[in-house]
Amino acid sequence: MSQAATPAADGKVKISIDPLTRVEGHLKIEVEVKDGKVVDAKCSGGMFRGFEQILRGRDPRDSSQIVQRICGVCPTAHCTASVMAQDDAFGVKVTTNGRITRNLIFGANYLQSHILHFYHLAALDYVKGPDVSPFVPRYANADLLTDRIKDGAKADATNTYGLNQYLKALEIRRICHEMVAMFGGRMPHVQGMVVGGATEIPTADKVAEYAARFKEVQKFVIEEYLPLIYTLGSVYTDLFETGIGWKNVIAFGVFPEDDDYKTFLLKPGVYIDGKDEEFDSKLVKEYVGHSFFDHSAPGGLHYSVGETNPNPDKPGAYSFVKAPRYKDKPCEVGPLARMWVQNPELSPVGQKLLKELYGIEAKKFRDLGDKAFSIMGRHVLVAEETWLTAVAVEKWLKQVQPGAETYVKSEIPDAAEGTGFTEAPRGALLHYLKIKDKKIENYQIVSATLWNANPRDDMGQRGPIEEALIGVPVPDIKNPVNVGRLVRSYDPULGCAVHVLHAETGEEHVVNID
C-alpha cells in the first residue's frame, strides 16, 4: 500500500493512495490539493471482476451461490438479488413464511455489516487505540478524540468508552453471523436462500434461539452504538459540513413487507435535482467513457443489454468500475439514500441526543437537512438504519410461523428474463438474468460499489465519491486523514496501512488508515 504526494507547478499537490481498500476490488484514490483543500479527485477500481462471464452457460440456480463470492462482507445481499431475479424469471411467488425467513436472514446480515462499517472500518479514524499492534504505528496529526477534547480526563474517558465498544462489537458481529446461519445454513455464503423461497422451515426452538441472540444485538445498538455516534458527532461538528457531494440519491427498496413486493421496510425511490421521484428501472444506464471497458455502440447501455468487454489499454480510462447513471445523473446509494427516500422517524435516542448535544429539534431524518449528506451525517444515518432494522427484525420474529412452508418448487424455463432489485448494506443492487435453452445467456450486476465509487462518465461528470471529495480539508498532505474519512463514510470496507513517499525528497511517511 503506497501513497505519493507529488507537487505541481500550479500550486497543487497530487496525492495518490493505492490501494485504499481490500474488499470488492482494489480502490485507488487520487486527489489534487490546493490551499489545503481537495480541488479534484479520481476514484479508480484497479481489478477486473468478470463474474458476468463466469456465469454464462451455467444452470441459473447456480448463480445465487457463485455471486456471493463477489464480497465476503455482504454475500447475503448478492444472494438475495440473485434469487429475486430467479423468482422473476421462473415466475414463482414466494410464500409469506419464505419472505419473512429471507428477511430474517438478510436483516441479521444488515446488522452485522453496519456494525462492522463503523466500529472496525471507520472508528479508528476517531478513536485512539492502545500502543500495541495493530493500532500502532499511527500517523502524526491524527485529529483523534484525544486531540479534539481539551479536557484530558474527559478525552481519555470518551476515548475509552469508544475503544471498549470497538472490542465488544467483535462479539456482537459474531452473534449476528450466528443469526444468519440459523436460517441461512452458514455465514458467509449462505445456502438457505434459493429460487422459490428458503430451504429452512423455522421451528419454535430456532425462532426462540434467534430471538435470544437478537436481544443482545438490539441492546448494543440502542445503549451503545447510537449514543457513541451522536457523542462523536458533537466533537466533530465540522464533519457535518464536509463531503456533501451531488445530493442525488437512489434506492431500489429492501425488505418486502407483503407477498406481492409492493411495500417495503425501506421503499424504492429517487431524489434528484432537489425533487422526489418514483424509481423507473428503464432510466438506469451504465457508461464506460472513462472505464476500462468497451461498448459496441456509443453512450450508456441499459443493464438488460449490458456488455462486459474489458479493455485495459483504453485511452483516457482509469477504472475497472463502470459508471451507472439514473436519468444520466450520478446518484449516491446506501443508507443515506434509503433513509432520505423513506424519511422515517429518528430513534428516540437520536431525537433526545440531537436536542441535548446539538440543540437540534429533529423528528424525521430529513429534518437534518444538508448535514445528512456529510461525512458525519452518513455515520449517523447508518446507526439510525441499524436501529430501524432491529425494530423490523423484532416485528418479523412475531410474524414468522413455525412449521409453515417456506419454499415453492419451480422449473427452469426454456427462455426467460428476470431482475432482482434490492439493497445491499452499502446501497442499491440489481442482478439481471437472461435464460436461453435453460442456461444463463446473459447476467449483469450493478452493485452499490459501482454507483458510489465510479469514475467520470461520458459527459465528464464525476462519480459520487469523487464529487464528495471536492472541498475536503487536507491541512497536512502527509496525513490526509479527511480523505480516508470521506471514503470510509461510504463503507467501501477499508483496512490498510498507507505509506506516503514525498516525490522530491524521497522521505517516507507512514499513514495508517485502518
UniProtKB/Swiss-Prot annotation:
One of its GO terms (molecular function) is ferredoxin hydrogenase activity. It catalyses: H2 + A = AH2. Binds 2 irons ions. Iron 1 has 3 cyanide and carbon monoxide ligands. Iron 2 has 3 water ligands. Binds 1 nickel ion per subunit. Ni(2+) binds at C71, C74, U493, C496. One of its GO terms (cellular component) is periplasmic space. InterPro entries: Ni-dep_hyd_lsu, Ni-dep_hyd_lsu_Ni_BS, NiFe-Hase_large, NiFe/NiFeSe_hydrgnase_LSU. Its cofactor is Fe cation; Ni(2+). Keywords: Iron, Metal-binding, Nickel, Oxidoreductase, Periplasm, Selenocysteine. The keyword Ion transport does not apply. Its EC number is 1.12.99.6. Its main location: periplasm. Perhaps the leader of the small subunit serves as a transport vehicle for both subunits. This is Periplasmic [NiFeSe] hydrogenase large subunit. The lineage of its organism: Bacteria, Pseudomonadati, Thermodesulfobacteriota, Desulfovibrionia, Desulfovibrionales.
